[in-house]
């Protein structure tokens, strides 16, 4: 019985040997020349910071510039019996214009949202909102990178 379980584990582990991560920087076929954001837009500035590693690439076949505009919305979607807000939803909408030097410009829109419960401690609630915002920004950056890798 132990030999059969060991054999199953070995077979399953050996079948996973072809794993290759999607977001490796080795297979990047684009170079970000310039990223324009509004100075007052914190979300766009965070996205710009996360994309900096793609602007330091050696000369690639596809050189692009980006214009990023982002909006964050937080609104109540449910109330408790007293009429106080109990559930919130945070939505981050990012409009990105991809300016390709070789081809036409392309506009893409990414929208991510997350629902969360209200907390009695307002400081913890604000920290939680910041964490959620960073997670949503990470998802948007991930989608943008996949979009840029597939666009030629």
Q: Which residue ranges define each predicted feature?
A:
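Bacterial signal peptide processing site
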Residues: 17-20
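Cys/His-rich zinc-coordinating "finger/knuckle" motifs
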Residues: 23
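Short extracytoplasmic
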Residues: 39-53
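Surface-exposed short loop/turn segments
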Residues: 49-54, 58-63, 67-134, 138, ...
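Amphipathic, coiled-coil-like alpha-helical scaffolding segments used for oligomerization/assembly
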Residues: 147-152
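Post-signal peptide N-terminal segment of mature Sec-exported envelope proteins
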Residues: 26-43
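Sec-dependent signal peptide recognition
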Residues: 1-10
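C-terminal motif of bacterial Sec signal peptides marking the signal peptidase cleavage site
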Residues: 12-15
